[in-house]
Amino acid sequence: MENKDLISQLLPDHVLHEILLKLATKDSVKTSILSTRWRYIWQRVPGLDLNQTNFRYKGLKGFVNRFLDLDKKSLIYQLKLEFDGRKYETEGSLFNKWVDSVVTRGVQHLVNNYCPIKLPGSISMCETLVHLKLVEVGIDSFDSVSLPRLETMHLLSVWFSSEAALERLISSSPVLQVLYIEKVWNVEVIRVRSQTLYSLRMRIWKRDLDWNKDLTKIGLVIDAPRLKSLNLQIHRFKDLVLNSVCSPLKVDISISKGEFNPINSLTMKTLRTFIAWISNVTNLALNYCCLEAMYAYSSSEPLPQFSNLTHLEVSMDSSCLKLLPTFLASCPNLKSLELWVHDHRLDILDISRSTMPKCLLISLKFVTIYSTAMISSSVENQVETELVKYILGNAAVVKELTLRFILWAEEHRFQLSKQILAFPKLSSACQVFLHSSFF
């Protein structure tokens, strides 16, 4: 029996175009050898997804120019280009020509990776753009900005002519839902003002600030009443202002060591504002520096009750043993706890002597401990096993406790498992799961 191309027989061209649009262009071109019908299908796909490394030098320019010139009236929904910026740093005018072209042809997805150019003004008034991702580009202060359909925006290592240029780009996107910012240049205070934003992620770490010689701290202003998910990884806060913002449902925050000093009234005010703001979250992730800051705060003022918090994730080292019970005491309804242990050397403090958090007695049901450090075959003097012992001995309603760890050798697993499973359990219904990998 002859092999038949059922896809070609059953599907119309426009469906095939949509299928190929989901592929990188180099893979889309390969379909031209399938049959006579497939030979030119890729040329009518309404988009490009190209990596400069797939071309000889200057080959990319010719390919894109030919593709865009095939039918200048056809729609182009997608333009994704990844460059070696060092080779294409002089090609800014050419790239801007391509952007100008697709803006007039209904582009919805624009991705520019590693081409150090300034965006053309046409992009600021694109009525069809839905997704925008920019890496290592420059943005001037446009005369006017209107992005009425833009829903997601990713800005990575983007240079702005002024703080107002960034603020305007965000505030002029009336349906923006997802915003990701990683490294922005020439911006000292990041202002996020949006009535529709529900997910905000920002990552500005120490090495990023080091490149900005005149910048040592970042200020952050958030005015987003519908925000539901917040992920902040910021090395140094200069100030934090929260306007018209409901407490989000999910918060993930990482800061640098010693960022908030309870003796300093200014940093204390910022910390007080932030803690009050996140006290109604249901899902919270903290690094150990955040835990230290909250512990220091609790020595001056009582922590608020995190009554809605049901899931907590903490990245910790041995010094956090004394801090964890203090924070858990403010989480009376916690149901799920994840602990990432990065240092297994046991602190001199005996965690078993700490105040008993209410959640251990009435609500905590699921605990997972991840060990990223190598542990030995003995349970003595190790953070992970001390935590297991503490939780099993004090959690009255816990159902599952899982420990994921790394061992030097497979023979150590049985010894360690035997000792852990011998720990006394307050909850008779608790199941203990041990998952190990080997160095």
Curated annotation (Swiss-Prot):
The keyword Transcription does not apply. Residues 348-405 form the FBD domain. InterPro entries: F-box-like_dom_sf, F-box_dom, FBD, FBL13/AtMIF1-like, LRR_dom_sf, LRR_FXL15/At3g58940/PEG3-like. Keywords: Leucine-rich repeat, Repeat. It comes from the Eukaryota. Disulfide bonds: none annotated. Pfam families: F-box, FBD, LRR_At5g56370. The keyword Repeat applies. This is Putative F-box/FBD/LRR-repeat protein At1g78840. SMART domains: FBD, FBOX. It comes from Arabidopsis thaliana (Mouse-ear cress). LRR repeats lie at residues 99-125, 131-157, 158-183, 207-234, 263-288, 313-341.
